[in-house]
C-alpha cells in the first residue's frame, strides 16, 4: 500500500476517537463524569420562566414590608396582568389563594390548607397546587471504565441511576388527622434536575372536597424516605390557587358585602325613632322626603345657600354612609372665629365619614365651573378615606367618576336620552300633569375594577367587580 494511502486510512480510523482522547487527557481512565447538575438540560428554559415566580422584584415592593411572600407576589402579578390585558383571570372573576401550614408527622412534612373561606356563590373553574420541588439526591456518579483491545481502546460511561419518584397525596381532614383522613387524590411526580416551582391541576380534588363539605385538606410530598423534619424556608411553602366565577358579584351592594369589615351602624347608636329593643335592619334606610340634590346629583347648596339648621333634616342620622355634605354655617365675625380656633378639638365619636367645610366649598366652586347639562364628573375614591386600606392591597385609589347635571327639555343628543326620558321631559315641559320630575342623569356605560385584598383569614384574593367606574352618562 502506498504511504499516502496508509496515512489517510490511519487518520480516518483515529478521527472518531478524538472526543474520547480529550476526555481522558490528563487523568487517564480514572476521570469522573461531571455531576448531573452541571450538565445542561431541557429544564433550564423552564427554570428561567420559574425565576419570574421566585424573584419578587417590583411586584413585592408594591406589597410593602411583611407581605413579600411568593403567594402575594403571584397574586399581584395576576392583578397586574388583568389590568394590562383586561382578560378575566382564569375565565372567571375571582382568584383565591390559600397558604399552607406546615406540620411534621412521622418525620415527614405535611401541609395543611383551610379552604373554608370560599363562598357558596363562587363556582370553581380550576384549581392548581403550586410547590417548590427540591433538587433530587442523585447517587454518586460512576467512574469511566476502559477495556483495552488489540487495536484501539473502548471506554463505557456508567451514568448514575434515576432518583426515586415523588408522590403527591391529598387527604381531607374530617378525622382531624393527616394519616386517617379520606384520600382525595394522588399523583406521581418526577423530580426535576434542579429545584424549581411546579404547578399541578387539582381541580377535581377541590371540587369533590367542596361537594362533600370537607374543605380542610392536607398535602404530602412522599418520596419514600424519612425526612429530617427541618422545615423549608417560608418562601418555598406550597400554596393553592382557586379560580372561580362568583355568581353573586353582580348583585346589589356586592362590593360592600365582600370588602366591608365593620358595621356601619355603631353599637349602641340607634336610629332616630327606632324602638330600643328593635332588631337591627341590615337594609339601607332612606328618608321619606327627597331633597333637590337627590334629583340632579349636584352638591347641596350649589344653587342657593341652605338654611343654617334645617338643611340636614331630610337625612337620617346614619344612612349606610352618612351624607358627607354638611350645611354651610353662617359667617362669624373675626373675633368669634379666632375664639373658635382656640377651642380644643374633640374628634367625632361616630365612625361615619365627615368632611370639613373648606373641602365642601372647594367642591362647590369646581361644580360652578362645570357644565349644567348632564355629563360625567370627576371623582377619585381613595380607600383610605373610607377605612378599607388596611386590607385592600391594590389599588390604593381609583377614578370612579359620577354623573350629574340637568336633563331639561329639549335634551341634546349628547346626553343620550332614552325614549322614555324624552317623553317624560316633554310631559314635564307641557305641564299638563303636575309633579313630574326631570329625567335623571345616570351612568350609561361602566367599567369593571379588579381589587386585590386580604380576606378574613388573611388570604390574598383577587376579585373583578363590575360597574365600578363610569365611562359615559345619559338621561334616563
Swiss-Prot record:
Glycans are attached at residues 114, 152, 277, 467. It is found in: Secreted. Disulfide bonds join 374-441, 403-473, 407-475. GO terms for molecular function: cytokine activity; growth factor activity. InterPro entries: BMP3/BMP3B, Cystine-knot_cytokine, TGF-b_C, TGF-beta-rel, TGFb_CS. It comes from the Eukaryota. SUPFAM superfamilies: Cystine-knot cytokines (SSF57501). Costa, costicartilage, femur, calvaria, trachea, aorta and brain. Predominantly in the cerebellum. CDD domains: TGF_beta_GDF10. GO terms for biological process: cerebellum development; fat cell differentiation; negative regulation of ossification; osteoblast differentiation; ovulation cycle; positive regulation of osteoblast differentiation; regulation of ossification; response to kainic acid. Residues 268-305, 330-358 are annotated as: Disordered. Residues 30-366 form a propeptide. The keyword Glycoprotein applies. Growth factor involved in osteogenesis and adipogenesis. Plays an inhibitory role in the process of osteoblast differentiation via SMAD2/3 pathway. Plays an inhibitory role in the process of adipogenesis. Belongs to the TGF-beta family. Homodimer or heterodimer. Can form a non-covalent complex of the mature region and the pro-region. This is Growth/differentiation factor 10. It comes from Rattus norvegicus (Rat). The gene is Gdf10.
Amino acid at each position: 500500500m502506498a504511504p499516502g494511502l496508509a496515512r489517510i486510512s490511519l487518520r480516518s480510523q483515529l478521527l472518531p476517537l478524538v472526543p474520547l482522547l480529550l476526555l481522558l487527557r490528563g487523568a487517564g481512565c480514572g476521570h469522573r463524569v461531571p455531576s448531573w447538575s452541571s450538565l445542561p438540560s431541557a429544564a433550564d428554559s423552564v427554570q428561567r420562566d420559574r425565576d419570574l415566580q421566585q424573584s419578587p422584584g417590583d411586584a413585592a415592593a408594591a406589597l410593602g414590608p411583611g407581605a413579600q411572600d411568593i403567594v402575594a407576589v403571584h397574586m399581584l402579578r395576576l392583578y397586574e396582568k388583568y389590568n394590562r390585558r383586561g382578560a378575566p383571570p382564569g375565565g372567571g372573576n375571582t382568584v383565591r389563594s390559600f397558604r399552607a401550614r406546615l406540620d411534621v408527622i412521622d418525620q415527614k412534612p405535611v401541609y395543611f390548607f383551610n379552604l373554608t373561606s370560599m363562598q357558596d356563590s363562587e363556582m370553581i373553574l380550576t384549581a392548581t397546587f403550586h410547590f417548590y420541588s427540591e433538587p433530587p439526591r442523585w447517587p454518586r456518579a460512576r467512574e469511566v471504565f476502559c477495556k483495552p483491545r488489540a487495536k484501539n481502546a473502548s471506554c463505557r460511561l456508567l451514568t448514575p441511576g434515576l432518583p426515586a419518584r415523588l408522590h403527591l397525596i391529598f387527604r381531607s381532614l374530617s378525622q382531624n388527622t393527616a394519616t386517617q383522613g379520606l384520600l382525595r387524590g394522588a399523583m406521581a411526580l418526577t423530580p426535576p434536575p434542579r429545584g424549581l416551582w411546579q404547578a399541578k391541576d387539582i381541580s377535581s380534588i377541590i371540587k369533590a372536597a367542596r361537594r362533600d363539605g370537607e374543605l380542610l385538606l392536607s398535602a404530602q410530598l412522599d418520596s419514600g424516605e424519612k425526612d429530617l423534619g427541618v422545615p423549608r424556608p417560608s418562601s418555598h411553602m406550597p400554596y393553592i390557587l382557586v379560580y372561580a366565577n362568583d355568581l353573586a358579584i353582580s348583585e346589589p351592594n356586592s362590593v360592600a358585602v365582600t370588602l366591608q369589615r365593620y358595621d356601619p351602624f355603631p353599637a349602641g347608636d340607634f336610629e332616630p325613632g327606632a324602638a330600643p329593643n328593635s332588631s337591627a335592619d341590615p337594609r339601607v334606610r332612606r328618608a321619606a322626603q327627597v331633597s333637590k340634590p337627590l334629583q340632579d346629583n349636584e352638591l347641596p347648596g350649589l344653587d342657593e345657600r341652605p338654611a343654617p339648621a334645617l338643611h340636614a333634616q331630610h337625612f337620617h342620622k346614619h344612612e349606610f354612609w352618612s351624607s358627607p355634605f354638611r350645611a354651610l354655617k353662617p359667617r362669624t365675625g373675626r373675633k368669634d372665629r379666632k375664639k373658635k380656633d382656640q377651642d380644643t378639638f374633640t374628634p367625632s365619636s361616630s365612625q361615619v365619614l365627615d368632611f370639613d367645610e373648606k373641602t365642601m366649598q372647594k367642591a362647590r366652586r369646581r361644580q360652578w365651573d362645570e357644565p349644567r347639562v348632564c355629563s360625567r364628573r370627576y371623582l377619585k375614591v381613595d380607600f383610605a378615606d373610607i377605612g378599607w386600606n388596611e386590607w385592600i392591597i391594590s389599588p390604593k385609589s381609583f377614578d370612579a367618576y359620577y354623573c350629574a347635571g340637568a336633563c331639561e327639555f329639549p335634551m341634546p343628543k349628547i346626553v343620550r336620552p332614552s325614549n322614555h326620558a324624552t317623553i317624560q321631559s316633554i310631559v314635564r315641559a307641557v305641564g299638563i300633569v303636575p309633579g313630574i320630575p326631570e329625567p335623571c342623569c345616570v351612568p350609561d356605560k361602566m367599567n369593571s375594577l379588579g381589587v386585590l385584598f386580604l380576606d378574613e383569614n388573611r388570604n390574598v384574593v383577587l376579585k373583578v367587580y363590575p360597574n365600578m367606574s363610569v365611562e359615559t352618562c345619559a338621561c334616563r
